[in-house]
Amino acid sequence: MVKAVAVLRGDSKITGTVTFEQADENSPTTVSWNIKGNDPNAKRGFHVHQFGDNTNGCTSAGPHFNPYGKTHGAPEDSERHVGDLGNFETDAEGNAVGSKQDKLIKLIGAESVLGRTLVVHAGTDDLGRGGNEESKKTGNAGARPACGVIGIAA
């Protein structure tokens, strides 16, 4: 079992953790989140981005992690970036707690997300269905108020 965590910080009140667990290279990865400080009753996009570089804030993380050259999509789509995690939903206080399994997110192997950045976006991810070029790249999910580098966890 490999475990990893991203501790979220940024230029906003959004904080939290996103954890990853994978039993072996052929198993799906469980992604769990506990994120506070978002807008209440909202859907917010979150993605794994290419770089683990946050020297200039979350913008240094680069584009979505996309080793196969696909267009942006929903986590359940066959045509999607590896880093496309979709949206999480917040409660009336702006907090989000949840988990999902993902078949493309890997902690083991050549396409591992270790050392890359998990970014929480300011808007809702349209899952590549927005009808414009930006939708096929970013899901029109907006600014990057919080992020954290994905590191090996104890």
From Swiss-Prot:
Subunit record text: Homodimer.
Gene Ontology MF term list: copper ion binding; superoxide dismutase activity
Main location: cytoplasm
Gene coding for it: sodC
Keyword Oxidoreductase: yes
EC class name: oxidoreductase
Protein's name in the database: Superoxide dismutase [Cu-Zn]
Cofactor: Cu cation; Zn(2+)
